[in-house]
Amino acid sequence: MALERSDVEKIAHLASIKLNEGDLPHITSALNSILGLVDEMQAVDTDGIEPLAHPLEASQRLRADVVTESNHREAYQSIAPAVESGLYLVPKVID
């Protein structure tokens, strides 16, 4: 599938992108190159190939999920200018 100038102009209009007239040939060529690459990838025979989440069969060593810090919420809220029901109150900044 090859894009023409009118296709690129329509895509730019739909995306609300303003393009310079001088850039249209370059952009059209670049988009056609990308679509050509997609066509090449679509042509590859992938029958019998299992989908992969990752190309390597490696697993990560994970640490134990252990709490390492204590809860300082009360100490932080005791010095806050305004707190209500455990939430910090801040001044309204948008009308």
UniProtKB/Swiss-Prot annotation:
Biological function: Allows the formation of correctly charged Asn-tRNA(Asn) or Gln-tRNA(Gln) through the transamidation of misacylated Asp-tRNA(Asn) or Glu-tRNA(Gln) in organisms which lack either or both of asparaginyl-tRNA or glutaminyl-tRNA synthetases. The reaction takes place in the presence of glutamine and ATP through an activated phospho-Asp-tRNA(Asn) or phospho-Glu-tRNA(Gln).
Keyword Ligase: yes
Subunit architecture: Heterotrimer of A, B and C subunits.
Top-level class of the enzyme under EC nomenclature: ligase
Annotated protein name in UniProt: Aspartyl/glutamyl-tRNA(Asn/Gln) amidotransferase subunit C
Keyword match Protein biosynthesis: yes
Annotated keywords: ATP-binding, Ligase, Nucleotide-binding, Protein biosynthesis
Catalysed reactions listed for this entry: L-glutamyl-tRNA(Gln) + L-glutamine + ATP + H2O = L-glutaminyl-tRNA(Gln) + L-glutamate + ADP + phosphate + H(+); L-aspartyl-tRNA(Asn) + L-glutamine + ATP + H2O = L-asparaginyl-tRNA(Asn) + L-glutamate + ADP + phosphate + 2 H(+)
UniProt family annotation: Belongs to the GatC family.
